[in-house]
UniProtKB/Swiss-Prot annotation:
Superkingdom of the source species: Bacteria
UniProt keyword Nucleotide-binding present: yes
Name assigned to this protein: Elongation factor Tu
Gene of this entry: tuf
GO molecular function, one term: GTPase activity
Alphabetized UniProt keyword annotations: Cytoplasm, Elongation factor, GTP-binding, Hydrolase, Magnesium, Metal-binding, Nucleotide-binding, Protein biosynthesis
Alphabetized HAMAP family for the sequence: EF_Tu_B (MF_00118_B)
Lineage of origin: Bacteria, Pseudomonadati, Pseudomonadota, Gammaproteobacteria, Pseudomonadales
Amino acid sequence: MAKEKFDRSLPHCNVGTIGHVDHGKTTLTAALTRVCSEVFGSARVDFDKIDSAPEEKARGITINTAHVEYNSATRHYAHVDCPGHADYVKNMITGAAQMDGAILVCSAADGPMPQTREHILLSRQVGVPYIVVFLNKADLVDDAELLELVEMEVRDLLSTYDFPGDDTPIIIGSARMALEGKDDNEMGTTAVKKLVETLDSYIPQPERAVDKPFLMPIEDVFSISGRGTVVTGRVERGIVKVQDPLEIVGLRDTTVTTCTGVEMFRKLLDEGRAGENCGVLLRGTKRDDVERGQVLVKPGTVKPHTQFEAEIYVLSKEEGGRHTPFFKGYRPQFYFRTTDVTGSCELPEGVEMVMPGDNVKVSVTLIKPIAMEDGLRFAIREGGRTVGAGVVAKIIA
């Protein structure tokens, strides 16, 4: 059967759920698709389908990033359900990087928890511009004062990480109720409708970087028999059209290829645009020639680099960072876009050590080249744990 063309009539916006494990992110994601299917006619996606990676069943926690889509009155939303569990921060980083706005799900019964804080911090790090809060499980809280207290705590936490806590919209409701089609005290379907209206009004229509040269970080690589190699990711900027020449940059020698097809949500497109999650079919590129962590770019626009100066912030112990200082020659992993690369740090003259909670300028030398430009953000990690954040200030080599 021929694939149907993707409907572009509504403006497109990327959102996603973040928050502590078991606070109801996946339930809310399913509830959003249910309510939007009834009100605006987009497709419904069941909880089990969103929560479907094999490991997730055993532990009841979401591990991989699930993509769903739904429509509001004015927009088409692509929604990622970000993993909540601390072990999967790596996916959280790639997931949250794909958002024009995030829905922070916080249980009204429990209040903010360690991962609530960590995900707000990560959102700040990876540049999520807007956060809307859904105070979930409100049907389990009888005390209005307690709800008010939790709301204040969440607002304080947002302000701590430079989000506008006082002005952030907070919707109070029950995702489970909405998923079951109930609406007692307007906490179910009505609350989720209100959430969608808030997404429409509070998250401005993102200005897409479509006029800049094409760049897409590669998240995954597939081989499709008879058609070739497909790379998937979110187009960071620009447009890719069928027959465009492209370069694959980073981690190894730069290679040249051609786009022979673009698809999104299993539908064929003539082009992929900034802000969209899509698959790009590459001519003459073997499955083993390309890997996650490389980028697909317009030829000649981005170069791979291994040495740069960066301004970094080292998380304090309270923020879940290191408990001890580090010294020159420190070798953590630097997480750029979709992958970790080990690098060593040189400290400025006169600086002997860097304490948790400090910010400092460092010179970094990576063991593999990364497609890089000034202003590129990264996370600093040790054995899977985020210990800092940084931004490329100046490329050296």
